[in-house]
Amino acid sequence: MPTFDTPEPIAVILELGVGDVRITADDRGDTIVDVLPSDPTKASDVAAARQTRVEYQNGTLLIRSPKGWRQWTPWGGHESVDVRIELPAGSAVRGTAGAGGFRCTGRIGECRFRTGVGDIALESAGLAELKAGAGDVTVGVIAGRTEIKTAGAVRIGRIDGPATVRNSNGDTSIGEVVGEAHVNAANGAISVDLAHGEIVAKTANGGVRIGEAARGPVVAQSALGAVEIGLPDGVPAWLELETKFGSVHNELDAAERPGPGEHSVEVHAHTSMGDITVRRSSTSADRGQQS
């Protein structure tokens, strides 16, 4: 179990064929690495763990597993390793895997993960670029720019920067996004509780729900599914709402055109089949009751 003296955040590079990675980031002055066979009874996994390189130099930790031919064939046995890392909070991590998952607890800095098949889970990151051919992506808080591409369920608590999410098969749920957000899905619903800036949400199959669009503009589009958009109390809106097979429900009170310099929200909502609803957001009502 290699241990390195790391009084400051470090950079980590992971290159795996098949395997799972678990990273724990906290306030510490060292880094501990443990590489284990995924199945200790398999000779190929034991050999892969033994042959995995673990090197630390000039603030960078490199972990590279051997890439045997069996990792890339469906009949070959797939040598697999499990990697456990404990490191200082704020460290930057970049990892790739042919097949395998990445899970991080604690606060890390820049995070870039790519896997062919496997789940990705982060508790807190400064920046995130997460790509999976197939797998769920679960994130607590991202402080900066976010790019996610996968086929699976996407669940994000809060993004404090701009975001691009592309999901080819699965539902996408975002609690709060501060920056400009573009969310696209081929097959799955899209839900955003609170969008502070411009948001574009499009899906070919599934509903689109924006709990509150604080500033806009808003583009919400579905080929097959309902669209629901909430707007803050007291903010005028410009609406373009169209459904081919469904009903349009505008629950906003009529208002005069906003004056020069007055904030308003521009909304474009379209669906081929499904209802469209525009209303005052429940979060605005909740804030009014608390004041």
What residues fall within each predicted segment?
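Intrinsically disordered, low-complexity terminal regions
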Residues: 1-291
